[in-house]
Amino acid sequence: MAAKDVVFGGEARARMVEGVNILANAVKVTLGPKGRNVVLERSFGAPTVTKDGVSVAKEIELKDKLQNMGAQLVKEVASKTNDIAGDGTTTATVLAQAIVREGAKYVAAGLNPMDLKRGIDKAVAALVEELKKQSKATTTSKEIAQVGSISANSDESVGSIIAEAMDKVGKEGVITVEEGKSLANELDVVEGMQFDRGYLSPYFINNPEKQVALLDNPFVLLFDKKISNIRDLLPTLEAVAKAGRPLLIIAEDVEGEALATLVVNTIRGILKVVAVKAPGFGDRRKAMLEDIAILTGGKVIAEEVGLALDKVTLEDLGQAVRIEIGKENTTIIDGAGQAAEIEARVKQIRIQIEEATSDYDREKLQERVAKLAGGVAVIKVGAATEVEMKEKKARVEDALHATRAAVEEGIVAGGGVALLRAKQAVGDLKTGDAEQDAGIKLIMKAIEAPLREIVANAGGEPSVVVNAVLNGSGNYGFNAANDTYGDMLEMGILDPTKVTRTALQNAASVASLLLTTEAMIAESPKAEGGPAMPDMGGMGGMGGMGM
């Protein structure tokens, strides 16, 4: 086992604070509408240019092990805030740095770190309550667009395309971000339920122009096994033919004689039928078949529920207004399922989302909710170069997260104003314990940091602006984009409450850990340069070559 260095007390904290400062100073230059760019080296290809705080934080690894520990803890603040709220990473980093810097002074002056921590926790709890009171629900498309624009570093085109996407697929719908092919951002919306399986034979195509099979007012047969024997299908086909309507068969697979018979019937015009494979694999396939059954008002024909293929009646089949089957996708529009049953299914999947442990499972479950609840929108990001594309895509994804957070918990005045107003409302919070009160005072000073940083990045004088904002009331604040004062909400400068709240809570949590650190253990640095090479026999005069 390698030897370790152990560092105690003030020295340990001082080294950690140095690491915190290095990381925070690199991240905080990106804050605000006039935030600067940071260039990240890439081992291959062109460097990446970004204004995204979490991207900068993720790149930082320091040579000094103790400094690096401090930096990594603050990196945790940024990434945790990003995971929960999707934005606010730079704000969280700036707050963490301010709390650590103020707190380190108090600890150095001999105050008890544990009492300081208790004071910090009380102040944060009071501020969070106040933020919730200030919060205003996000209802209009305009507000959604403003939140998106602010998060995408004041890019209005991003805000408006996110608002449009939410309009089309609803607040719960799935919105994905992809790299586009053109210079401008584009929005594609798929209404109804779409899954990634197409027709099993091109002979099913009845619209040669679009190369798709269109079924109007069809029945839907859902079967969880392979169909290879046409005899099992005959009763269903006869009943559907009598009703004079088309049929979509979704099964694990349709092969051999069964597929050939369906194709022949379609070509001869005896029956309009299309077969597709069921989406997904294993348990996910079962769940998705069940989703389609609920959406279309049918049943999944499976032996485990006592239903056999040759005993199927028209009542067991699902129905839809229209189904479009392409080479790779099938879209069911306006299924005949009961709204209450669909709603119950969505609730059930939401519970599974909360319990899901992996991001992959969570994402797949969210897709299922969207398919049942409304549709899927795809934002295609346009850019001139690959470097710009990467930077823009990251910003659009951030903006999308922030917008979802705004819809979830509402909005507060942006630009660091909400925290100052919360500070004023909490007023003179006292606990009766001098050291805990010092913790409260420390937080009340630290929450000015985001506004100070925004002003500094815009080339202004932070103290002057902070005093001017504190003398105002309500949503009165400073617009760094054009150096004016006014109502932040009216100027469209807003932050999702969830983002501001999460940034404050995570920053205080990690800063408290740093302040209550009393010892640090890190591997000792290895001595530079190995031992000299031994004499090389037979090569006189070259012995002891220093390497």
UniProtKB/Swiss-Prot annotation:
It comes from Delftia acidovorans (strain DSM 14801 / SPH-1). Forms a cylinder of 14 subunits composed of two heptameric rings stacked back-to-back. Interacts with the co-chaperonin GroES. Together with its co-chaperonin GroES, plays an essential role in assisting protein folding. The GroEL-GroES system forms a nano-cage that allows encapsulation of the non-native substrate proteins and provides a physical environment optimized to promote and accelerate protein folding. CDD domains: GroEL. Pfam families: Cpn60_TCP1 (PF00118). Disulfide bonds: none annotated. Keywords: ATP-binding, Chaperone, Cytoplasm, Isomerase, Nucleotide-binding. One of its GO terms (biological process) is protein refolding. It is found in: Cytoplasm. InterPro entries: Chaperonin_Cpn60_CS, Cpn60/GroEL, Cpn60/GroEL/TCP-1, GroEL-like_apical_dom_sf, GROEL-like_equatorial_sf, TCP-1-like_intermed_sf. Belongs to the chaperonin (HSP60) family. Its EC number is 5.6.1.7. ATP binds at residues 30-33, 51, 87-91, 415, 479-481, 495. It catalyses: ATP + H2O + a folded polypeptide = ADP + phosphate + an unfolded polypeptide. Gene3D superfamilies: GroEL (3.50.7.10), GroEL-like equatorial domain (1.10.560.10), TCP-1-like chaperonin intermediate domain (3.30.260.10). This is Chaperonin GroEL. One of its GO terms (molecular function) is ATP binding. GO terms for cellular component: cytoplasm.
